[in-house]
Amino acid sequence: MAPYLQTSLIWIAYAVAVGLALFAAIVTTFTWQKPRERSAVVNTVAVVSLTSLLATVLLLPVDIALVSSTGSVHLGVNKEWATPEHVAGMLRTLQIVYYSLYSLDALLCLIVIPFAYFWYEEYDEVEEEEGTRSTGAKLWGAFKYTSGFIILVLILFFVGFFVPAAGNQKGGHLDLDYFKRLLAANKGEKALTFAVGLLVCLGTLLYVLYTSSGLALLPISFIKSAPSISAPQLSETTASALERNRERQRQLELRNGGNHDEMPSKDRRELESLVREERTLVRRARLAAEAQGEGRSWVYRTWTKICAVFRPLKLVGGILLLLVSVIVWVSMLITTIDKASNSLCKGHCGYILGQIKIFQPVNWLFLQAAKAFPVDYIIMAFLVLFFFSSSISGLATVGIRFLWVQIFQIRRGRTAPQAILIATVMMALIILGINYSIAMMAAPQYSIYGTQTFCTAEPTAHGKQPDCSEHPEMVRPCSEGFKQPLAKDICTPSVMSTFLNRVTLNWPVFGAVDFWAQVAFLAVFLIVLVTSLFRTPKLNMSELDEEAEADEEEGLLASTGRRFGATWQDITGRSGQASNQENGDN
């Protein structure tokens, strides 16, 4: 009963996490999308896709938890209930869930999302009102463009089905049972391995750009979130500028007797410039008033004050996240050096590391946390979500680009539906890169075997498990490098690590690209971190004015509700100088 209870609790926790992922996907989609350009089709596809992606990335802690539950950490042997048949059934269930989620992700990202993208592009408001184009015509137009992606999926599958695996030709020198099992795959598995391996490579390239940037920028955004001007101060500064502007307009009109037709061209140009500036200042004053809660309910004003009060906690959280980022970076650097120096077969198998030779902080932390169940699984879930959130942060900062040309911006409340769909596809590929990075670089030993250990003593009789109850020093953490025959029966690798190692062993070029991309990841993170640490956050007034103008055109000024820094001023509602004057500029 105990093993079934533990397994059930793990799956129940996963189901709850997926439910929270659905809620997060809904909030994320509606928060980032333009309110006036919302589409039911785009929203549904984006929510389902994001939920599927989060469910996929959250499956890794479940995978590790299940394989870890099969063994006794202190004795280095399988538990009584962990028979080969029971373990095989558990792994088969995990494989089914993995294959189902990855197949769903591939279907969504390569077919459904492109179809939704072209469906939205086919939409025309005039044709919709006049009824000149049928739904069937729009469906055909979207399917016509989506067919190219369907052909791409078929090509990937058939190439993987017929291309011989390079690992089969170079695997003869690998005398470890673990690697031999990785090479044993049928044609269907080989085709799927090739397709996913190629997508992992593409995702790793995006991961290098976006996740590395986000991993550095996300903590810094918490630490340096306070801009250099507060809402009360912005209101006062804007009011002063608006008063000077109108005074100058009155001077120009008095100078020319109020006759605009006889006004010199120089004065006319200056007056036109002042009028444009006045409109900008009026919009800015409205935003400052809304930021202070004027015209809003007491609930909103109270919430704004609470956020200002707890802003120091945001600073502390940013410092802690920065510490986590640095520790993860150091751990990945150590793993990179360890793999480059001590890999069993170097580039021939994608730099698979048989056993950790250098102390690795993150891996050590997981092994120590495993002593207090389920702390290690909670930390792993946090690490996975931290990488995921960092990817979103990097995507929002960098935007969707082709080379140096920005195609779409990812901004809260201003993201076009097309950008939402493209960003979802990019996040799907990045998820593959995150899975590789966490499993192979951040916590390589823990991600493969979890907390499993192996008793190196010889069994007392044939068919019996070894006994290390009186020799705890002979209990070692499981690793791919063990050559004992019983090791393969006691040490059960996670499904994710097995799949990734199969990719890198069968197609070493994928493994080489994924491995050396981690070096680029470390370099980009360091550059972005150092740069952002020495940059002072500034309030982008031009961007603020653009957003205010867009809100005014859309009639959405009531929902803007921006907050500015200067904690104490936002709490008191004063700028530290004279009280704000009424603008009367509406």
From Swiss-Prot:
UniProt-listed InterPro entries: LMBD1_LysCbl_Transport, LMBR1-like_membr_prot
Subcellular location: Lysosome membrane
Entry keywords, A to Z: Cobalamin, Cobalt, Glycoprotein, Lysosome, Membrane, Transmembrane, Transmembrane helix, Transport
Keyword Amino-acid biosynthesis tagged: no
Source organism, top-level taxon: Eukaryota
Record GO biological process: protein localization to vacuole
Pfam families recorded: LMBR1
Gene Ontology terms: cellular component: vacuolar membrane
Transmembrane segments: 10-30, 47-67, 96-116, 147-167, 191-211, 315-335, 378-398, 420-440, 509-529
Glycosylated residue positions: N540
Keyword Electron transport in annotation: no
Membrane topology: Multi-pass membrane protein
GO terms assigned for molecular function: cobalamin binding
Function: Probable lysosomal cobalamin transporter. Required to export cobalamin from lysosomes allowing its conversion to cofactors.
Entry's family note: Belongs to the LIMR family. LMBRD1 subfamily.
Listed name of the protein: Probable lysosomal cobalamin transporter
Organism of this sequence: Pyricularia oryzae (strain 70-15 / ATCC MYA-4617 / FGSC 8958)
